[in-house]
Amino acid sequence: MDDQSQPGHPQPDSVAAIASLNDPIRRSLFDLVSHSATAVGRDEAAATLGVPRGTVAFHLERLAQCGLLETEFQRRTGRTGPGAGRPAKLYRRAAHSITVSVPDRHYDLAGDLLSSAIEESDRTGEPVRQALTRVSVERGRSLGASAGSLDAVLTFTGYEPLDDGDGGLLLRNCPFHALAVSHTDTVCQANLALLNGAADGADEREREVCFAPRDGYCCVRIARRAG
């Protein structure tokens, strides 16, 4: 998983991206581009759909702004140099996936942690559970250092932190809920290690990460340090 796909990095608004397809012209354009073997230009799209070129250009740009399409420039005449004309702006479906879940889930992050742990175990002979803890701590440190605070990591990663009234936080949502239900020990271990790493990376001094399972909440809570 590259850095731009990690929680804590700005991402296109997934809800807005999906909602943008509610417009019938925009949906038709997205389908046209998605099913094309090559990048599609504005003239081609307008001719195929029988829609004015200006309208097509507007909707293609909106789809690109939402992160559903990527753009490139090409000279389709095959000519180069002076007199070859301006390159045409072309569109193709974005390579990354856009998903929407309510509450927020990050199964991509869980899958990356588990895959990395297995690869490390195969490479070094380290037991998989130990590798998972280490990999999760390292990823958490990276997220904490990048976000600048533990609270930012919790928010971006979908934990839905709530003030517990005692200087700490309850985490209303588990970003790995379905996996945690099926593989509780493994996923909760990785979750705890991830947030311990995030606290360390963000240089969190006033609070600590605790394993405290509670119905309706994440298995981890953030507690005020004693003393």
Residue ranges and their predicted role:
Residues 100, 168-173, 220-222:
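Generic recognition of long tandem-repeat/solenoid scaffolds
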Residues 205-227:
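Short terminal or interdomain "cap/linker" segment that borders an active site or interface and mediates
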